[in-house]
Amino acid sequence: MNKMLYIKTYGCQMNVYDSNRMVDLLETQGYNIVANMADASVIILNTCHIREKASEKMYSELGRIKKLQQSRLKAGKSKAKIIVAGCVGQAEGEEIFIREPAVNIIVGPQSYYNLPTMLEKLDSGTENHLIDLDFVEAAKFNKLPEVLKSPTVSGLVSVQEGCDKFCTFCVVPYTRGAEFSRPLEQVYREVLNIAQQGAKEVVLVGQNVSAYHGKDENGKECSLADLIKYVAKIDKIKRIRYITSHPNDMTDQLLSLHATEEKLMPFLHLPVQSGSNKILKLMNRRHSRERYLEIIQQLRELRPDIVISSDIIVGFPGEDDEDFEATLSLAKEARFGQCYSFKYSQRPGTPAAVKQQISEEVKQHRLSILQAQLMQQQLECNQKLIGKVVPVLFDRDGKYDGQIIGKTPYMQSVCIMNEKDNNLYGKIVNVKILTASASSLFGEVYADS
């Protein structure tokens, strides 16, 4: 049987991790990954539900797949099996079958380990529509195979899933379930595995990774700081990052680790969502503007060169001009070096979705103002490195022939022209920064490297 797999990933780094694990899982069943959807016998869309636009992208893609299926039939080929995985599948369930009957399997983010069994049922011809949306977190990791290959020199490892915070705008507690942390040794073994395959950097990921509370082999509960210190013992791992955190779970132990653990990179993504205490309360964020800025100040005292990244939502129901100005001032005071900003998007089933909504025009106007400020802040952050020599981990080819791209410790992309055809992929090399834009740095290998 022709077993060709195509997978398209939407959304967060957790979804990227899940897609990689689905590939590992199905490769053990004889599937080969293909780059062209038209060549696939199985097509997986691993979906995101965080914003309305993200889920609509999936339906648009399903429309294109239906046209592809028709072309296959005309050419005398069989249809590909279509799988909707991830958070849209979890949130919308059988409604997807109603809207798009061409979909064969719907599987949630905690139950995709059952894909081999579900595909076997499809092959037997006894079923045409299958669905599995169980929240059985431990089973997922216990039943997945070992990572077969680290996709890049920077590997993602899921350590924590789900969220118990219930922010009023967010679907994560409903699509990913309650907070669950993997055992310490299980995470360590996975990091060791990808390190032995060439990964130099590990990114510990979770919906609320700073709430990690996995247990060691003796049943003792461990914090994220404990996990980072343990993973740092792996010699081949040179860089450690973690994402995404919640301010309420940033303990003194974790903050202090930024000053003492040399493998922990001087970068932190810490979403704030709003600079207004009124809006933070309406969002059920459970922290204040002042507390957030205290954390940032503490981090900068511990690690003066740290770069802070964040997420901000504009146009949340109830946000007025004064609230928006508070967000602008917080972004400036926090000196975000990077920031992802979005218009509020109603998500069905969340408390904020039923409130009085702000007009699209006002949301777009505020977003434009905020993004202009953030772009300038990011440019200024990048320009500070001009003339300096920084260690860069090269992990991918650039847009142009001979160009290679890597990351600084501060998560900035660095482009160089690899004119001497040196094999820099997977290496940490000192680079002198020559110029900077808001999105990238440009440099050359430092002569003394």
From Swiss-Prot:
Location of the TRAM domain: 383-447
Binding sites annotated in the UniProt record for [4Fe-4S] cluster 2: 163, 167, 170
Binding site for [4Fe-4S] cluster 1: 12, 48, 87
PROSITE patterns: MTTASE_N, MTTASE_RADICAL, RADICAL_SAM, TRAM
Swiss-Prot/TrEMBL cofactor(s): [4Fe-4S] cluster
Subcellular location: Cytoplasm
Annotated MTTase N-terminal domain residues: 3-124
Pfam families recorded: Radical_SAM (PF04055), TRAM (PF01938), UPF0004 (PF00919)
Domain of life according to the entry: Bacteria
Main location, first listed in the record: cytoplasm
Family per record: Belongs to the methylthiotransferase family. MiaB subfamily.
Name by which UniProt lists this protein: tRNA-2-methylthio-N(6)-dimethylallyladenosine synthase
Source species of the chain: Orientia tsutsugamushi (strain Ikeda) (Rickettsia tsutsugamushi)
